[in-house]
């Protein structure tokens, strides 16, 4: 097979595999809904053990769908829809919708100037969520995550810092490599996709350890002219 055709083949394969997996996952979800409805008919409470196992299956279905979404996002080229946007709004929106675990404190540090960028904020929001996911998962016992918006003369920055153990080996670049992960679950594509979305818009994604204070990942975008 010609090497230059490999990316197209990978896209086709991922699309086909995701289609074949999504269909049974949808059937499982619908069947779970039917079971819960029938067992809870007339306002009856579900048996705690039954409810627990239904919740486990629902969680596994969600995890499988998340993996499929990551694979597709990694393989396909996103058609950007850029528009003037506020980075302060981006971190506030994410903070308002993110399911923060009870043991984690999420802090926001807005940019007083709130500089404007011309960006696809859906893609940037996805990238931010990937970084925030990694920060939260790095602190299973709890800790603090800070999301900060800032800027310099040419770039606007979105930084997420955590109080976890820091990056493995102290190598900031390694975390952006495809399929790199230190977690027992997941396929290690989230930060790869985050960097991809930033670079598509002329931006960058950088990571570094903060001595004694965990990891710090910064997403940067050009300021609007």
Locations of regions flagged by a protein language model:
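Conserved catalytic submotifs in the C-terminal HATPase_c
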Residues: 105-115
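Short conserved segment of the HATPase_c
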Residues: 167-178
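Conserved micro-motifs of the catalytic ATP-binding
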Residues: 78-80, 116-119, 182
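Histidine phosphotransfer helical core of two-component systems
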Residues: 2, 9-13, 24-62
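Conserved DHp (HisKA) dimerization/phosphotransfer helix of two-component histidine kinases, i.e.
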Residues: 48-77, 81-85, 89-100
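Short beta-strand/loop element within the Bergerat-fold HATPase_c
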Residues: 142-154
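Detector for a conserved hydrophobic position within an alpha-helical segment of the HATPase_c
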Residues: 198-199
């Amino acid at each position: 097979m010609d090497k230059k055709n490999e990316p197209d083949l990978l896209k086709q394969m991922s699309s086909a595999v995701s289609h074949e997996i999504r269909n049974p996952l949808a059937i499982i979800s619908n069947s779970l809904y039917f079971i819960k409805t029938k067992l809870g008919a007339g306002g009856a409470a579900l048996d705690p053990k039954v409810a627990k196992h239904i919740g486990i299956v629902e969680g596994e279905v969600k995890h499988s769908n998340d993996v499929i979404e990551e694979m597709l996002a990694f393989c396909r080229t996103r058609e950007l829809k850029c528009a003037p946007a506020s980075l302060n709004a981006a971190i506030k929106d994410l903070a308002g919708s993110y399911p923060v675990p009870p043991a984690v404190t999420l802090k926001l540090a807005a940019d007083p100037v709130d500089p404007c960028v011309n960006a696809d904020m859906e893609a940037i929001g996805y990238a931010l969520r990937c970084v925030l996911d990694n920060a939260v998962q790095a602190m299973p016992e709890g800790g603090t995550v800070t999301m900060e918006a800032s800027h310099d003369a040419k770039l606007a920055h979105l930084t997420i810092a955590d109080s976890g153990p820091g990056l493995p080996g102290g190598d900031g670049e390694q975390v952006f490599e495809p399929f790199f992960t230190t977690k027992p679950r997941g396929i290690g594509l989230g930060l790869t996709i985050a960097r991809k979305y930033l670079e598509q818009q002329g931006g960058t994604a950088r990571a570094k350890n903060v001595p004694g204070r965990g990891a710090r990942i910064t997403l940067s975008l050009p300021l609007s002219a």
